[in-house]
Amino acid sequence: MNKKIILTALFALFTLSASSTTPDSIKAFLADFDSVVYMAEHDYAPFKFKVTKKNEKEYNALKKQLVKDITKGKRTWQDAVFAYVGWFGDHHFYVFGDNKDVYANYSKYARKRIEYRKQMDEYHSQPMSCKVDDDTWLIRFPSCDKTQEWAEQAAREYKASGCPNLIIDIRGNGGGQDDSYWPFFLMLFDTPDCSRDGVVFRYTEASIKRCGLTEERLKSLGLPTDFANAPEYLVWIKDGATFTYDSICTFPKKAAIIVDNSVASSGEQLVLDARLASKRTKIYGRDNTLGCVDTGSCPHYIIARRGVTIQYPMAYSTRWEKGTCVDPTGIAPDVRIPLPCPKRLTDNIDEWVLWVAEDLKR
């Protein structure tokens, strides 16, 4: 009995001693890492789909190993955060910081994408609206970030052109706001009453505060202000919501959307909407899109004293619930372009555009 008491006392003393010898700096690093884990587990929208019974042991082992590595000085707390966030493989969930090295180092752990700049002499897609030939008009739309006004102008130019065929080239379009592509979608739409996938918020007080939404703004949006009694998962767009418009545009007769592996988020949503509601539109490309469209509405979690910021999605598509996710495989083109990458993609009419223009004439 006395032997057991002595052993217990020695163990307690050893534990206390080990704890007391942990430097304050390491404790601070661990606290920062733990705060990121807490945010992911309590605010990251698709967490319950990302960590399941199948991979729960792997996830817990990763956390344990990263804490151990920080404690023993085998890796920095930043590197542990990079490895942790990268494990989820979600391009809407990523790390950046006060200098470009933060994102560069995080990218080592992020889900890989095709690096077209290594395959081409110049990869810098720029907005274009011009005639390819007598039958075909090209709109190159490389971003959905605050570009709706430009899109409206490009749509007007196409309508005035008289060209029966339209190519919308969205290579390199990493997203932005869905409203930006709406002028194009309204031209492509030809299938009334087709139903969209829904959107669900993981509705936490922390995320709402990070978005900067006031109580008045929440009320104007019809969202709960009593977080204690609000549902954790709140349906924002009901699954099966339909597209219905008053008219269908006569032109284009045929349409193409050109994609690549850099197309993501709102860029991919344009592809999904067109595939759903436009029978006259085909998707062309060599590679699948990135696969970054099943999450969204992203606030920032800032670790101010460390110069590190984490973007994470507070919303997910109901495709997660239905097992029909686009992420992470991306959207496959309807037609695979049988050509290598062009040497240049800037403000030029490249080989892919010419090939697609000919294919639309068939």
Show where each model-derived region lies.
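Flexible, glycine-rich surface segments
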Residues: A230-P299
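Conserved active-site loop/cleft motifs that coordinate metal ions or position small ligands
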Residues: Q311-P313
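Sec-dependent N-terminal signal peptides
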Residues: K4-S17
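Flexible, low-complexity junctional segments that flank or bridge functional domains
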Residues: S20-L223, F251-K254, R280-K282, T289-R305, ...
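Residues that cap or initiate secondary-structure elements
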Residues: D145, G174, V263, Y316-T318, ...
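Cell-envelope and extracellular/periplasmic
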Residues: R171, F251, I257, I331, ...
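Cysteine-dependent hydrolase recognition
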Residues: E215, G222-D239, Y245, V263, ...
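Active-site rim recognition segments
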Residues: A315-I349
